[in-house]
């Protein structure tokens, strides 16, 4: 037998070579998969990527090597002591080290795969691996299943870490025993000085806790806005939904103000959020689709007013924190001073995500805080950024403001409820059928290439069986609960920091989502069919000092948020705001504002469905847009399609009872009128029964489009209201 020291070095060498060989095999496998285009662009943009950005694709594959090297180092640090400890029980030769190293590597890989299956099942089809776990729960009960879960996710890693730590502590003790005492003394002295520095708090910049500002003015209220992309108001339990999707939001509503019928003027994120924070309609601020040019963005930045800018002038700290759905704030900050969001709407980000998704080690080991620092691009990917990361950043910001007592406006924005409805397993399983085994098990299985390169996708999805619709809806509801948990964490932190009674909270969304209502399928912003679901968002306010909770069923708009919040903190509204303050309703000064809703659709990704009609349409996205290298490689609408996109827009005027829609057709304008009281899903056109209603709403729409004047319900119907207009004989 060789000397013990030689044996240790020999074992370490074999472990290192085996681990690095294993990781090299993983890397080469990912490269071959990428080269085979098993997951990539299969539309017109693929040609652009290969011909003009091949070097970027190569570089992206090289960048991930640092991840492989770190994983290899971690594997060696953990596996080496385990192999050594095994060797103390039974001696083995070179190949014994190799297969034991491979065994531990496989166990570690299996552990991380199991965690990935439970937390992010959408990263791959692991149903063949997860089947035994589901069967265990069905046969033995959830108690046994939970015990196995704890064994795998807690006991196994803890045992491995304790064994490795014990080994290294023993080795460290042996080293210190042989080391020179002066070295030990120096180390202790340095550690002591650092400890004293930390304990004393030397150098920490403290700000006095001030309840009042200079001049004796009372400190203004903070404002926290929490939103989720595609959050439907009618899927919150506080709004009567049949599932308990929003217990934390419900508690806010139970103490606050719930505007039950709040609508966004456009159901597309960039345009909607611009309208929300500028309090202007899209045809006023100029951002009317999701592929604006630099000139359009510059114009909006220069000319549009904003909630953030008004509050910043009052001394507020203003910040927006979000994941990939908040990427628009990079180009359109809307007055926010601190922008902590991902950069998603960028062709190079898309290409990077295609590359990174081939390398399994990234979701396995680096979808966390450390990984996001090592690979900043991960925060820009829809598959990687998690609500926990956004919430942690929001909480950190709240702690900072609690320390300096500066009033703040904070917008936390999440992608929780956005397509394709991906959640960790425990959310996905909340309301889905455990026996379901179709394509939408973990997410809405959307083929991105069909979405980008075709316009007839509605025809395919309109035939979806009822059980598939129920599965997708249940997945969406799990997403709502995931967002609700994030809201709960933020509110708890405000209370912990003593800020809750000094903070106005608004829970909302940028728009809703279609979930296969009549004459629509999925998505948002392409049609007013099916009802209000794509434009209807929560508007739940927590207002400190409110005497009793309120519910308002009358119409409100996201345009009204900015003037309302300014009113509540005592700041005058910007004269160019087009929204109205809802504060008079909250304070009980008025019973009604008589607001009417005016809206438009956004970019038309696929053809609309109007029975018996032929709506206007445009070519698919990969024909109408291009990648602008002078605008940070963003997707930009081609000049020749600017007018075409505007001409395909539907417009809508809605009052409490009636909804008038004007749709551009191939041969003529298509006008429809719906009585929402009798027909909430807009299936029966009533324009011939209510010709006067149709005429009045049509005139109000024309005036809004040409002069920007938005009529009130009294101006549209007269002082007696819409119910006085009688139908003609059938």
How should each PLM-predicted stretch be described?
Residues 2-730:
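Catalytic domains that recognize anionic headgroups
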């Amino acid at each position: 037998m060789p000397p013990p020291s030689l044996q240790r070095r020999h074992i370490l060498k074999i472990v290192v070579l085996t681990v690095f060989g294993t990781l090299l095999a993983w890397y080469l496998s990912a490269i071959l998969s990428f080269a085979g285009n098993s997951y990539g662009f299969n539309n017109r943009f693929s040609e652009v990527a290969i011909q003009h950005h091949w070097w970027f694709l190569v570089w992206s594959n090289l960048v991930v090597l640092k991840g492989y090297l770190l994983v290899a180092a971690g594997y060696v640090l953990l596996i080496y002591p385990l192999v050594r400890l095994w060797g103390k029980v039974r001696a083995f030769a070179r190949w014994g080290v190799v297969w034991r190293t491979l065994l531990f590597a496989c166990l570690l890989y299996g552990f991380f795969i199991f965690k990935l299956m439970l937390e992010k099942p959408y990263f791959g089809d692991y149903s063949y691996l997860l089947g035994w776990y589901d069967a265990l729960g069905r046969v033995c009960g959830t108690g046994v299943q939970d015990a196995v879960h704890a064994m795998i996710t807690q006991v196994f890693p803890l045992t491995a870490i304790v064994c490795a730590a014990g080994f290294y502590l023993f080795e460290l003790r042996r080293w210190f025993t042989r080391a020179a005492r002066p070295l030990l003394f120096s180390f202790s002295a340095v550690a002591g000085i650092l400890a004293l520095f930390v304990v004393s708090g030397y150098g920490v910049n403290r700000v006095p806790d001030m309840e009042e500002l200079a001049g004796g003015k009372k400190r203004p209220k903070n404002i926290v806005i929490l939103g989720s992309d595609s959050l439907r108001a009618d899927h919150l339990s506080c709004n009567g939904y049949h599932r308990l999707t929003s217990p934390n939001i419900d508690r806010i509503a139970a103490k606050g103000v719930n505007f039950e019928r709040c609508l966004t003027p456009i159901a597309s994120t960039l345009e909607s959020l611009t309208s929300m924070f500028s309090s202007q309609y899209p045809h006023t601020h100029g951002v009317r689709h999701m592929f604006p040019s630099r000139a359009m963005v510059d114009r909006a930045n220069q000319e549009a007013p904003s909630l953030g800018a008004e509050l910043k002038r009052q001394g507020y700290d203003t910040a927006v924190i979000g994941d990939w759905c908040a990427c628009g704030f990079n180009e359109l900050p809307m007055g926010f001073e601190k922008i902590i969001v991902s950069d998603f709407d960028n062709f190079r980000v898309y290409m990077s995500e295609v590359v990174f998704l081939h390398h399994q080690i990234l979701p396995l080991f680096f979808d966390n805080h450390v990984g996001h620092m090592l690979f900043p691009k991960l925060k820009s990917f829809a598959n990687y950024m998690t609500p926990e990361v956004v919430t942690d950043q929001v909480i950190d910001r709240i702690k900072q403001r609690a320390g300096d007592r500066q009033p703040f406006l904070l917008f936390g924005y999440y992608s929780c409820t956005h397509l394709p409805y991906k959640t960790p397993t425990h959310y996905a399983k909340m309301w889905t059928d455990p026996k379901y085994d179709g394509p939408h098990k973990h997410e809405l299985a959307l083929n991105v290439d069909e979405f980008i390169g075709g316009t007839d996708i509605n025809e395919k999805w309109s035939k979806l069986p009822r059980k598939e619709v129920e599965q997708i809806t249940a997945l969406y509801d799990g997403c709502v609960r995931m967002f609700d948990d994030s809201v709960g964490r933020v509110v708890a932190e405000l209370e912990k920091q003593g800020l809750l009674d000094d903070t106005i909270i608004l829970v909302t969304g940028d728009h809703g989502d279609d979930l296969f209502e009549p004459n629509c399928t999925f998505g948002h912003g392409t049609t007013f069919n099916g009802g209000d679901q794509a434009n209807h968002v929560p508007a739940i306010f927590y207002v400190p000092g409110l005497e009793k909770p309120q519910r308002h069923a009358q119409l409100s708009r996201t345009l009204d948020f900015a003037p309302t919040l300014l009113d509540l903190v005592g700041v005058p509204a910007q004269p160019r705001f087009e929204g109205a303050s809802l504060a008079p309703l909250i304070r009980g000064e008025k019973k009604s504002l008589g607001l009417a809703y005016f809206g438009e659709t956004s970019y038309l990704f696929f053809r609309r469905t109007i029975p018996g009609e032929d709506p206007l349409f445009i070519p698919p996205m990969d024909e109408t847009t291009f990648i602008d290298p002078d605008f940070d490689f963003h997707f930009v609408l081609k000049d020749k399609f600017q007018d075409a996109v505007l001409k395909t827009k539907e417009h809508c005027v809605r009052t409490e009872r009636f909804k008038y829609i004007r749709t551009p057709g191939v041969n003529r304008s298509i006008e429809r009128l719906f009585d929402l009281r009798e027909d909430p899903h807009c299936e029966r056109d009533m324009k011939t029964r209510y010709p006067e209603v149709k005429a009045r709403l049509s005139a109000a729409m024309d005036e809004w489009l040409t002069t920007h004047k938005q009529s009130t319900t009294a101006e549209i119907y007269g002082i007696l209201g819409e119910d006085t207009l009688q139908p003609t004989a059938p």
